[in-house]
């Protein structure tokens, strides 16, 4: 079975001018995935469950594992000579690696270090999301905010690690999506899901229906559409919502479905972060044949206006996302 290391080397060989910088970053992400996997698996036996007593920049209570994952990722990336800077959902501002090595590096990383961390206490799957861009500021100087405020269509790689019944690393560099499952007996990620493709049609819809009364009319209509019986379109669809973006998206990637986190009266701009969640997940979805929008626009074409900008997210199987968007457009003026 092909290992992640072998796969990275093999893919790099396809590009004669490649210098191995992106491969080095992916190797660091592989290492931090092992570290976070190890600590999540013993979370109930050590003092890293529960809240830390600290709020992040979003005003949300940080879990102890949020901080652990954030610090682990920052340390792993700072050790790489290819990384010029780092931005995390857990930090108010970006971090410029202001050393000679960092100033001469080409890439920046954005991450949600531990998505769905509130689920850890009840032993539900969580994940790490990452996004990689080439910097746009001059090489030789520290990175600037401009480097991080790029639209998602400028990503050179994105991916996630899902920590569940098994730990999987799924990523794309713009040439398809591949998944690697961690074998703890040998300490290696092995290629288990090659050239992943999201089904064009799906039967699963994932949304927090407890917020139904606060949703836009287009979302309400789509939920009703999913629940109606119609043999021709294989409805009613199945409702599955874990509450962890990575876990919900991963299931729908494999089986076909739509994940929706819309705007609502209590969060009119949506709740997920464009740079840390929306863009990397949208890049993966499109590379696997899926679609990702904010209900009206392609996620990857949105020009960011703030480091922690929020966005509604409709992502998944092409036919399902397009149907949801059709219903959103119907009520656009309301």
UniProtKB/Swiss-Prot annotation:
Cofactor: Mg(2+)
The UniProt record lists the keyword Cytoplasm: yes
Any one GO BP annotation for this protein: gluconeogenesis
Positions with a binding annotation for Mg(2+) 1: 89, 112, 114
EC number: 3.1.3.11
Record-linked Pfam families: FBPase, FBPase_C
InterPro entries with a match to the protein in the record: FBPase_C_dom (IPR044015), FBPase_class-1 (IPR000146), FBPase_N (IPR033391), FBPtase (IPR028343), Fructose_bisphosphatase_AS (IPR020548)
Entry's cofactor comment: Binds 2 magnesium ions per subunit.
Binding site for Mg(2+) 2: 112, 115, 277
Keyword annotations: Carbohydrate metabolism, Cytoplasm, Hydrolase, Magnesium, Metal-binding
Assembly mode: Homotetramer.
UniProt cross-references to NCBIfam families, sorted A to Z: PRK09293.1-1
Protein name stated in the entry: Fructose-1,6-bisphosphatase class 1
Organism per entry: Haemophilus influenzae (strain 86-028NP)
Organismal lineage: Bacteria, Pseudomonadati, Pseudomonadota, Gammaproteobacteria, Pasteurellales
